[in-house]
Amino acid sequence: MTTRVAARRSAATLRGGIICESLKPGTELEGYELRIIRWSRYEIRDPAPWQPSVWTLIEFEAPADDSDSLAHRLSKDLAAPGWYANWNTAREAVVVFPHKIFRYKRGDSSGRETAKEYGRHCGVPEAQLDWDD
């Protein structure tokens, strides 16, 4: 694969994570071209009172064209309080909370802080506001 093709492919792909326990019962993510990169379970040291102490994280890739529809879907399917999902494209970071979506240029500290502030307002523990962008 040439560098140009690889760059085009990475620019056209989003990569992120969804914690299974953050989804409302009955959630189905059908119709998206999600490709699971890793499926892992791990213990959380200091979960919030409403969070379980063991989480299942699905790390995934999908076509960047699915970013908007996936964000809108997850904004309806994430449980409240205190959960979010996030992903990045080559240029953009996307953070999805219940009923609220944040998009900002990767590396934009102001955009990141706006999303983190909203997360704090929604009850996400500070230590969990640690997504990569």
Language-model features, listed with the residues they occupy:
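Acidic, proline/glycine-rich low-complexity IDRs
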Residues: 102-133
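Short acidic, gly/pro-rich beta-turn/loop elements at beta-sheet edges
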Residues: 26-28, 68-70, 129
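Short, intrinsically disordered low-complexity segments
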Residues: 35-106
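Sparse, context-dependent recognition of short Cys/His-centered cofactor- or disulfide-binding micro-motifs
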Residues: 3, 43-45, 87, 109, ...
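N-terminal, charge-rich interaction modules
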Residues: 3, 7-53
